[in-house]
């Protein structure tokens, strides 16, 4: 045993009286105690020693504390070993930890943060001068005494810096406060005491924002992002709230390169901590804890107040008078037939694959335009494509084991089929993706079937001012599946492309049905019973088209958006509506007793369903939310049974534990104007992008966790007003481009030019001031090199370069005789909506295929994701209750 390690064998209760347990540390419980001889208070950590346990860790902590005597270090009193328990006695800090304090007071003031940072740096300067490092600096390990002194505690992970171990090749600490070189210890080869300075910067952000950066991420995901070469050091979110000195202090402490990061002595000379700072700042903080003034602290994730007007939680559909005649449009709704909606190649797939790698959408009122061959290539390869990710997992495994030992019970599941992120993180990129050149116009490679287009690029990059995003040095993604020339995907522009059904004979449907039948027999799928959804009944297998069917009469809600979801347990199909009054749902299996039920009481302007996860822009701050749909429905069902319900949605986040919450805010997404979701057909990755007031957030779907995770936050001055916001997938780029505008083309044969922000790039491309924006109402990427652009009364089908897609079988321009408000792409046509009706025009001939017009009604498309939902109100009373319709009647299968 170390000679400097003295250990008393006497009964510690002869010297100390335990008063109460005040917390649990890394290796044991902590008690408040009183010295029976002197009356002095002490903190005693009681550690139960297990057989075979590594005693060196405990010994290390005792040696560390005994050797350190400094005003900013918790004082060590002595140690006792009694039976199988070790008692470590140390100085008692009555003020508690900063983490406990800010949970009561809210964010610390800038001067209070400066004072705490200075005292912490003084303690670290002392430790580092003695050849030691702390390695776990965070708010929970910075304590205050009753008189406002700052003390560093918890040396359970401290380590001496000796000549033989100048860099610790170990991995211990809390991930969110961890320096990049610590996260990448296996690859970088170690770290030194400068990792403590990084933690000081993270702690400063924690005290200002009540949590460290990336705290919403799984610890393993946070580590993975920190090890990527394009990782950007975090910053304070609110630029205006804090001084330039504070921003610069955080920037210096969070210098990514440890060789350039200032040490404690250097950082103590920063103006942020050299300003006049007295202990009274900490005393004021303690007074606020002891006498909390709830009126002065408002959580900046404050929930919405209850609406002034009571909103019913259950809204029944009004019964139509039997004598009341149908409107002209409702009569036409039952007569005009529509082809199925077109499933875009860049549209995320909501279903989970079955064992054969196919999706069975028999439970949906939806139809795909993609061929079985396309699906085979995509999903058949999808199972094999995971193999390239299988690299060495030693770093993540060691990290996960260490996190588990340190109390992080949650971990990533070892999902062989879906855990892309964890496997990516173990790979070393051989060659980073090439940076694009920096001219005004950027060439984007085209598919070989677009040889007739010119080779001048036209997609422009808008500036990512402030902190341009860097491309990630990640393993190369698998090459996109190549379609055989004789069977290209739908909407291809070659002679061999599938013919879009501009006629009413259903030839395309029959063609694909025959292919499906052949494929199913080959797979022997015919013997497998299909899952059935409890919604509107499917039509017979003879293709008869679909029509609009009324599903609700007299809806009082001010609806913004709509989507649908199928409950995996009951197989019931639900429509989900986002409205001013909240999120509501309608069970299509109960249309005989139609009623809407409220799921979430806050204003909602955008909805999207991914598997069993509902994404929404909700609340008075227009923040992105993630909802667990089964949990949301279960909670709503339980609340209906209670005589008096306490809505969990209204409970503050800290009262309701995260694991019990069915709805959670996605951090860094407040004031979201628009959102879009896209799937990269080259990689299968799915992305969610949000347009905030002055920035863009990019999130990626993580399959094992079934949630979107933030991967990019790009500062960017948004156009005002922001008319359109879509993502465009381009070849050989990891992340999609973000299109924020469309201007008129300038190059030869160029009709439009896409104004984009490139999350993959380290450089900025500035939008030319003399490029006028066009009145674009809709942009959607149908295929890899096929984009539909809606301009006023015209729809143009272009490639990524903005040139018209020329084909003998497809029309590249569709013209309408009204101002287009919204569109839905059908199998054979584009269905355009205007104020008093809708009109469909053939992809092949630009001829009218369907038309419904009723000047007595005002129509509005509420959603076309999975199910087309339409709203209708009387023209002479636009504020009257609305009727709701869906496009239904297609066979629910591939």
Swiss-Prot record:
Entry keyword annotation includes Cytoplasm: no
Q: Which GO terms describe its biological process?
A: intracellular signal transduction; protein phosphorylation; response to UV
- What spans are recorded as compositionally biased (Basic and acidic residues)? 340-353
SMART domains the UniProt entry points to: CNH, S_TKc
Query: A Pfam family matched by this chain, by name?
Result: CNH
Give the residues annotated as coiled coil: none
Q: Which residues form the Protein kinase domain?
A: 16-273
Q: Which CDD domains match?
A: STKc_MAP4K3_like
Which residues are recorded with the post-translational modification N-acetylmethionine? 1
What is the reaction catalyzed? L-seryl-[protein] + ATP = O-phospho-L-seryl-[protein] + ADP + H(+); L-threonyl-[protein] + ATP = O-phospho-L-threonyl-[protein] + ADP + H(+)
Task: Indicate which residues the UniProt annotation says bind ATP.
Answer: 22-30, 45
Task: Report which superkingdom the organism of origin falls in.
Answer: Eukaryota
Question: Can you give the residue ranges of the CNH domain?
Answer: 556-867
Give any GO molecular function from the UniProt entry. protein serine kinase activity
Q: Does the keyword Cytoplasm apply?
A: no
Compositional bias, Pro residues, is annotated for 473-487
Which catalytic residues are annotated? 136
Q: Which residues carry this modification: Phosphoserine?
A: 329, 398
Enumerate the UniProt keywords alphabetically: Acetylation, ATP-binding, Kinase, Nucleotide-binding, Phosphoprotein, Serine/threonine-protein kinase, Transferase
**Function of the molecule:** Serine/threonine kinase that plays a role in the response to environmental stress. Appears to act upstream of the JUN N-terminal pathway. Activator of the Hippo signaling pathway which plays a pivotal role in organ size control and tumor suppression by restricting proliferation and promoting apoptosis. MAP4Ks act in parallel to and are partially redundant with STK3/MST2 and STK4/MST2 in the phosphorylation and activation of LATS1/2, and establish MAP4Ks as components of the expanded Hippo pathway.
| Family that this chain belongs to | Belongs to the protein kinase superfamily. STE Ser/Thr protein kinase family. STE20 subfamily.
- The protein's name: Mitogen-activated protein kinase kinase kinase kinase 3
Q: Species name for this entry? A: Mus musculus
Its taxonomic placement starts with: Eukaryota, Metazoa, Chordata, Craniata, Vertebrata
């Amino acid at each position: 045993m170390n000679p400097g390690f003295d250990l008393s064998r006497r009964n510690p209760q002869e010297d100390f009286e335990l008063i109460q347990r005040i917390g649990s540390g890394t290796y044991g419980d902590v008690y408040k105690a009183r010295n029976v001889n002197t009356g002095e208070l002490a903190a005693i950590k009681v550690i139960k020693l297990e057989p075979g346990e590594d005693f060196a860790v405990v010994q290390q902590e005792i040696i560390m504390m005994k050797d350190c005597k400094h005003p900013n270090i918790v004082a060590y009193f002595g140690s006792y070993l009694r039976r199988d328990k070790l008692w470590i006695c140390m100085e008692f800090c009555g003020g508690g930890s900063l983490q406990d304090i800010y949970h009561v007071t809210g964010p610390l003031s800038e001067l209070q943060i400066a004072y705490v940072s200075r005292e912490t740096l003084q303690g670290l300067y002392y430790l580092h001068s003695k050849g030691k490092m702390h390695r776990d600096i965070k708010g929970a390990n910075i304590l205050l005494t009753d008189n406002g002194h700052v003390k560093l505690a918890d040396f359970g992970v401290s380590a001496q810096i000796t000549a033989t171990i100048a860099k610790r090749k170990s991995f211990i600490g809390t991930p969110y406060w961890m320096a990049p070189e610590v996260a990448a210890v296996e690859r970088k080869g170690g770290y030194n005491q400068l990792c403590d300075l990084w933690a000081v910067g993270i702690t400063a952000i924690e005290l200002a924002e009540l949590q460290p950066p990336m705290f919403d991420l799984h610890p393993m995901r946070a580590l993975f992002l920190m090890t990527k070469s394009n990782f950007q050091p975090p910053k304070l979110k609110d630029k205006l709230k804090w001084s330039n000195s504070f921003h610069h202090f955080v920037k210096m402490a969070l210098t990514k390169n440890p060789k350039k990061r200032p040490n404690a002595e250097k950082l103590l000379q920063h103006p942020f901590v050299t300003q006049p700072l007295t202990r009274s700042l900490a005393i004021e903080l303690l007074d606020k804890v002891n006498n909390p003034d709830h009126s002065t602290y408002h959580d900046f994730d404050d929930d919405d107040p209850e609406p002034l007007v009571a909103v019913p939680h259950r809204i029944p559909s009004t019964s139509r008078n039997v004598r009341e005649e149908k409107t002209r449009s409702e009569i036409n709704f039952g007569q005009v037939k529509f082809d199925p909606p077109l499933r875009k190649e860049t549209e995320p797939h909501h279903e989970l694959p079955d064992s054969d790698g196919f999706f069975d959408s028999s439970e949906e009122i939806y139809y795909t335009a993609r061929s079985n061959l396309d699906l085979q290539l995509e999903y058949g390869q999808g199972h094999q494509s995971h193999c390239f990710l299988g690299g060495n997992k030693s770093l993540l495994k060691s990290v996960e084991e260490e996190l588990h030992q340190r109390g992080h019970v949650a971990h990533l599941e070892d999902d062989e089929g879906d855990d892309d992120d964890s496997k990516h993180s173990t790979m070393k990129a051989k060659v980073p993706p090439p940076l694009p050149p920096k001219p005004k116009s950027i060439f984007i490679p085209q598919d070989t079937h677009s040889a007739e287009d010119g080779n001048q690029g036209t997609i422009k990059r808008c500036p990512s001012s402030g902190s341009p995003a860097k491309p990630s040095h990640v393993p190369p993604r698998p090459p996109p599946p190549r379609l055989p020339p004789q069977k290209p995907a739908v909407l291809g522009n070659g002679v061999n492309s599938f013919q879009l059904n501009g006629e009413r004979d259903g030839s395309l449907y029959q063609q694909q049905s025959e292919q499906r039948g052949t494929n199913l027999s080959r797979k022997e799928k015919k013997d497998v019973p299909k899952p059935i959804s409890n919604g509107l009944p499917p039509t017979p297998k003879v293709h008869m088209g679909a029509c609009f069917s009324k599903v609700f009469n007299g809806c009082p809600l001010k609806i913004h958006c709509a989507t649908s979801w199928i409950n995996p347990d009951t197989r019931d199909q639900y429509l989900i509506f986002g409205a001013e009054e909240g999120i509501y749902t309608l069970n299509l299996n109960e249309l005989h007793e139609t009623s809407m039920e409220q799921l979430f009481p806050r204003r909602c302007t955008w909805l999207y369903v991914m598997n069993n996860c509902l994404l929404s822009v909700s609340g008075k701050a227009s923040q992105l939310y993630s909802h667990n749909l089964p949990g949301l429905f279960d909670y709503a069902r339980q609340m209906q049974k209670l005589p008096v319900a306490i809505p969990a949605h209204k409970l503050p986040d800290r009262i309701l534990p995260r694991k019990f919450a069915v709805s959670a805010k996605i951090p860094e997404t407040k004031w979201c104007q628009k959102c879009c979701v896209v799937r990269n057909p080259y990689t299968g990755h799915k992305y969610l992008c949000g347009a905030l007031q002055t920035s863009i957030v990019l999130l990626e779907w993580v399959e094992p966790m079934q949630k979107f995770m933030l991967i990019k936050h790009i500062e960017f001055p948004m156009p005002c007003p922001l008319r359109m916001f879509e993502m465009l997938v381009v070849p050989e780029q990891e992340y999609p481009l973000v299109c924020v505008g469309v201007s008129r083309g300038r190059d030869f044969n160029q009709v439009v030019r896409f104004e984009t922000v490139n999350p993959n790039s380290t450089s900025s491309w500035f939008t030319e001031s003399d490029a006028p924006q066009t009145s674009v109402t809709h942009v959607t990427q149908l295929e890899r090199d096929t984009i539909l652009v809606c301009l006023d009364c015209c729809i143009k089908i272009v490639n990524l370069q903005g040139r018209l897609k020329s084909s003998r079988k497809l029309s590249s321009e569709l013209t309408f005789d009204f101002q287009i408000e919204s569109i839905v792409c059908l199998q054979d046509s584009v269905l355009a909506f205007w104020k008093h009706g809708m009109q469909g025009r053939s992809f092949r001939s630009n001829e009218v295929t369907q038309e419904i017009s009723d000047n007595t009604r005002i129509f509005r498309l509420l959603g076309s994701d999975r199910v087309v939902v339409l709203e209708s109100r009387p023209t002479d009373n636009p504020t009257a209750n609305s009727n709701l319709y869906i496009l239904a009647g297609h066979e629910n299968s591939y």
